[in-house]
């Protein structure tokens, strides 16, 4: 039963992620091969920025599980603050690099002749990179939620991000064209971060109790 409580929500979350990414890819594809090339390169670059914070998130998950198991729930907020601070330190170089030198970063993946693809990728990086600091907070709270075993909370925080991103992208593309796709990312991230912070506070306050 315990395995099912953790596994089923996780499986549901992964399924929703896959479907939503397919829908987003379909929207991107509608703008042609050049735009797709820029999107593909930009998301690869974006993933590099996420790796350090994802590792911090995994560490936070282990830290949370260990402290809950030891009956030291009060130590979790201290770990959260430390994790966020470290994540911010790791995020600053990526933000500066992507925001200021977005053209050079895109040039690492695309040839000099791919001007339109490079420009679309630059636009993506300049829109999403300032949001990395908010994502740092989300990933730390994600780690705490997973470490506490509250997988339902994790799914509830992830799904609205993906759904809202698709809805907003479809709305904004009507007004801003392809730029509307990139603008949808922050909307989803803001919603997800707010939800994870709410769930984090419930876990820390003891309103959510996990049976160890």
Range-by-range predicted roles:
Residues 1-23, 27, 48, 52, ...:
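Hydrophobic faces of transmembrane alpha-helices in multi-pass small-molecule transporters and flippases
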Residues 10, 14, 22, 26, ...:
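Transmembrane alpha-helix boundary and packing residues in multipass membrane permease domains
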Residues 15-44, 48, 66, 104-114, ...:
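Helix-terminus/linker motif at the lipid-water interface of multi-pass membrane proteins
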Residues 54-57, 128-147, 153-165, 181-197:
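Short runs within selected transmembrane alpha-helices of multi-pass transporters and secretion channels
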């Amino acid at each position: 039963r315990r395995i099912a409580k953790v596994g089923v929500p996780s499986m549901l979350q992964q399924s929703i992620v896959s479907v939503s990414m397919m829908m987003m890819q379909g929207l991107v594809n509608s703008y042609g091969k050049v735009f797709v090339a820029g999107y593909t390169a930009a998301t690869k670059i974006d993933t590099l920025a996420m790796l350090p914070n994802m590792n911090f998130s995994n560490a936070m998950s282990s830290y949370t599980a260990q402290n809950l198991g030891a009956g030291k729930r009060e130590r979790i907020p201290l770990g959260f603050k430390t994790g966020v601070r470290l994540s911010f330190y790791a995020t600053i170089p990526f933000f500066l690099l992507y925001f200021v030198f977005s053209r050079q970063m895109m040039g690492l993946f695309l040839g000099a002749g791919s001007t339109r693809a490079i420009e679309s990728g630059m636009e993506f990086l300049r829109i999403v990179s300032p949001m990395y600091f908010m994502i740092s907070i989300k990933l730390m709270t994600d780690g705490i939620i997973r470490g506490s075993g509250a997988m339902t909370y994790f799914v509830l925080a992830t799904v609205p991000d993906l759904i809202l991103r698709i809805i907003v992208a479809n709305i904004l593309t009507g007004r801003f064209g392809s730029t509307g796709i990139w603008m949808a990312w922050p909307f989803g991230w803001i919603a997800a971060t707010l939800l994870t912070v709410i769930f984090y506070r419930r876990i820390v306050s003891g309103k959510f109790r996990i049976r160890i």
